[in-house]
């Protein structure tokens, strides 16, 4: 569905939206044919910590319906922090993960993922982060291209999340 990006509302959302995030995630899995390699399946428990500051979760709304969301996750010194795999990052606490960015299938192709990336970068800068990193399936050229269009560079390919091959990208902000 073609929409005008100026008709969208992007705003921080709270933990009460997790059921909607999971619904959008499952819609994406169904659209992708159920491939578990394309996207890591998250649960309520894996998403809940993303709502703790300084992490940020943004929802994108069109006519009052959430059509997309993005998560900037401050993983700190936990094993979730992608900075451990990036040699240039000397202090992992300076990195935030772009954990998830999902657009409902009917609304793809409108620049929404790039809009989310830019807004999440802004939040990261305001919180004092120096780096943002993200992993993307090599079978997801759309997200790879969107990240690269936003200035992210490929660091390496590696196995994450129980053996899934991912492209690690990073950007100094």
Where are these regions (language model features)?
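A short beta-loop-alpha structural element at the N-terminal edge
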Residues: 5-23, 34-35
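Active-site rim helix/loop that mediates acceptor-substrate recognition in acyltransferases
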Residues: 35-63, 71
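Conserved beta-strand-loop-alpha-helix junction that forms the acyl-donor binding cleft
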Residues: 108, 134-144, 162
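Conserved active-site alpha-helix within GNAT-family acetyltransferase domains
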Residues: 114, 126, 138-156
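Conserved GNAT acetyl-CoA-binding A-motif
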Residues: 124-136
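C-terminal "cap" of GNAT-fold acetyltransferases
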Residues: 150, 159-173
